[in-house]
Structure formats: structure tokens, C-alpha cells
Regions:
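Acidic, polar-rich low-complexity tracts and alpha-helical solenoid repeat scaffolds
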Residues: 4-7, 16-166
Length: 166
């Protein structure tokens, strides 16, 4: 009886973690397939399994980026997309997707969340970290569009500072 109970517990454990025997590449392919079928939660689960089970694999950073991209482009949850892109920048700072993630953070703040100060901060951080990157012209374009907004922000801050000093 005890052996049957142990066997049942083991089988339940295996069925709950169906991704445990899959390679990072298999999980990546599953995540991509689920996404193409619009099974977004399954896709995210596959990508999270890569991050959890293969944290040092090159696909871990790409999986984190894909999660952020799903929230940005598929679910349109822009705040959560920013959080997920921030994880890429924090956890994988040297990976190729980190700089694109930093750009996307600024882009989302500017174009979707209307958090212009945050957009300016992140665009300037991008310029500082990647001064010769191919995205610099896009960063400059976005910052140019934010100049008037920045002037308004500065003016409002000046008014607030004057009132608090009275």
C-alpha cells in the first residue's frame, strides 16, 4: 500500500511538471508554437520554464524577451510589458536583447503609457549605454518629439518649486 501511495505521488508530480524533461530548445519551440496558436498562457509557461530550468542558457534571455513581447503585442498589457522588459535589462544586461528591451521600455512609456519623464530617462540611458548602436537615430527621433513635452514638464516643475519656496 505504501509503495502504491509513493508511486501515485510521483506520477502526480511528473504530470504537474510536464516540461521537466524537455530541453531548452524544445521549450522554446513549444513557446513559439503556442504563441502562433494564440495560446498565450501556455506560451508564457513554456518560456518561464526555460528561465527557471535553464537560467544560463542563451535562450533564457530570449525567453524573457518573448514574455515581454507577448504582453506588449498580444495582450496589450503595457505596464506588465515594461516590467517584463525591465527583467531582461536587469537579469541579462550583457545579452543582445537587453539593449532592445531598454529601447522598448522607453518606447512604451512614450507611446502607450504617456509617462514622458520615464521615456526621456530611459531614452537618455539608452544613449549613454549604447552611444553607437543602430537604434540611436530612433532614440534621437523620439527624444526630438519629446522636447516640447520636456519643456512643459520643466516649466511645471519650476512653478511647483516656486510655490513650495514661498
Amino acid at each position: 500500500m505504501k509503495n502504491i501511495l509513493i508511486l501515485l505521488i510521483g506520477l502526480i508530480g511528473l504530470s504537474c511538471n510536464g516540461n521537466s524533461n524537455k530541453s531548452a530548445n524544445q521549450l522554446w519551440n513549444d513557446g513559439q508554437q503556442f504563441r502562433s496558436e494564440e495560446k498565450l498562457m501556455e506560451s508564457i509557461t513554456s518560456f518561464k520554464s526555460i528561465i527557471k530550468d535553464y537560467p544560463l542558457d542563451d535562450l533564457a534571455a530570449k525567453a524573457q524577451f518573448q514574455i515581454a513581447d507577448i504582453y506588449l503585442n498580444d495582450t496589450k498589457d503595457f505596464e506588465f510589458a515594461v516590467e517584463e522588459f525591465e527583467k531582461v535589462v536587469k537579469e541579462y544586461p550583457e545579452h543582445e536583447v537587453s539593449k532592445k528591451s531598454l529601447f522598448m521600455i522607453a518606447y512604451i512609456y512614450n507611446n502607450y503609457l504617456e509617462a514622458y519623464s520615464d521615456a526621456i530617462i530611459n531614452y537618455n540611458l539608452f544613449k549613454e549605454k549604447y552611444p553607437s548602436d543602430e537604434l540611436i537615430p530612433s532614440v534621437e527621433y523620439e527624444l526630438e518629439g519629446l522636447k516640447d513635452i520636456q519643456a512643459t514638464i520643466d516649466s511645471l516643475n519650476s512653478i511647483v518649486n516656486k510655490k513650495t519656496n514661498l
